[in-house]
Every structure is written in structure tokens, then in C-alpha cells.
A protein has these predicted regions:
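Long, contiguous binding/interaction regions
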Residues: 1-220
Length: 220
């Protein structure tokens, strides 16, 4: 199984794109996959932001797929890719015993490999995995893409509701007070669960990705 997704970010103040299999953030590392295998390929056509042009990506996507299939036969799993500063960097994890099989030969491009003992999957958790803000961006993007598929005019403001759940009434009230200061309305709801403290906030906003993500991050 896999749960691949991507998000844009910056690394060392330079534009970057990260493609990561979020499946492992739920189930944890496979047994014995204690070693981080890194393959870096120098892109020939960097593009405007150093993340590669579509034609460059087409070549390296094909090679990436080929490499993943080859390494999977030796218990090495592909977990993510970073594109930034003209480098196409792929990360794999597997047992240390698989090191002899980790060889990279991209078409007409310079490459380097590194192998690190990383039983805690620190690189996966701290670098590849999205922050809370980026996770919210990914969820917001999915919603916007669904609206686009329905031909929604995203830039037209409309009432948008946001739900939040709390363990105490005090936590809910503090949240509502802060949100109302930013122009949100507390849509009162009756809950059948006396221990359930729910806030339903609304505000008129466009629902293009930039606008809706900005609204969500006010409420997070």
C-alpha cells in the first residue's frame, strides 16, 4: 500500500517540492528497515526555480520508477523525493545488508549516493514529512481540486463553515473568542453529547487555495 502526496516548501530559503509516501507515517517503518539510502541526481534542465522542467521530470520519473522496482526486490522501500537547487534527491529505507544493491546510474546525468544508519527514520520524520501547516495545505488543496472538478467559480466569496472539537468548554470558548476577532461567526449548535465541545465557525471567503488556506490557518 502507499499514500503518495506532494507539497511545495522551501529548504535553506530555496524553493523545493517534496513527494512523500505518508503511509509510513501511519504504520511506522517496516521491520529491519534501519538504513537510509540517498540517491542524488544533478538535473540537466533546472527550470526557473531549480526544481526541473517538465521534460527533465519526464526523464527522471521514468528512471525513478525503474530504480524503485529494482531496489524493491532487495527489501529497499522508496519513501520520498526532494527537488530543489537543481538536484533530484530520492530517499529509500531498507536493511543494511541491502547496501551492495544500492547502485544508481541515471541517463547522462551525474549522481551520488549516501547510506546512513537511521533506525528512527529521522530523515523521513523531520525532513520529508509535512509540518502541520503543510498538512493543512494538502487537505485544503484536495478540497479545492474537488470543487474545481465541479466547475466551481472559486473566487466568488461565500459562507464557509469550519468545525473544531475540544475536550473542555473553556478551550472551546477561548477558541471562539479568538476566531470572532478575526471576523468569524460562532454558529451555535446543539450537541447530544454533554462531553462534546464543538465550535462551528463561519465567514464569507473565496475558496481558491490561497484564500481558503489562509482562513484555515487562522483557525488552527
Amino acid at each position: 500500500m502507499s499514500e503518495w502526496d506532494f507539497y511545495p516548501c522551501t529548504i535553506d530559503d530555496r524553493p523545493a517540492s517534496i513527494f512523500v509516501d505518508l503511509y509510513f507515517s501511519r504504520i511506522g517503518p517496516p521491520v529491519g528497515a534501519d538504513t537510509h539510502f540517498v540517491a542524488r541526481i544533478a538535473m540537466l534542465d533546472l527550470g526557473t526555480h531549480g526544481m526541473g522542467t517538465p521534460s527533465e521530470a519526464e526523464v527522471l520519473y521514468a528512471y525513478e520508477t525503474e530504480l524503485e522496482e529494482k531496489l524493491s526486490a532487495h527489501e529497499i522501500v522508496y519513501v520520498g523525493r526532494i527537488r530543489t537547487r537543481g538536484v533530484w534527491q530520492m530517499s529509500f529505507y531498507g536493511p543494511a545488508s541491502s547496501k551492495p544493491y544500492f547502485q544508481v546510474s541515471p541517463p547522462d546525468r551525474a549522481s551520488t549516493i549516501e547510506v546512513h544508519y537511521d533506525p528512527a527514520w529521522s530523515f523521513y520524520e523531520q525532513t520529508l514529512s509535512p509540518s502541520i501547516e503543510r498538512r493543512n495545505w494538502m487537505r485544503d488543496r484536495a478540497v479545492v481540486e474537488e470543487l474545481e472538478a465541479r466547475r466551481d467559480p472559486l473566487v466568488i466569496p461565500r459562507k464557509v463553515e469550519h468545525w473544531a472539537y475540544f475536550k473542555t468548554a473553556d478551550a472551546r470558548e477561548a477558541y471562539v473568542e479568538r476566531a470572532t476577532q478575526d471576523g468569524f461567526t460562532d454558529e451555535k449548535i446543539d450537541s447530544d453529547e454533554p462531553s462534546s465541545f464543538v465550535a462551528r465557525m463561519s465567514r464569507e471567503d473565496p475558496v481558491d487555495l490561497e484564500s481558503i488556506h489562509a482562513a484555515v490557518m487562522i483557525l488552527v
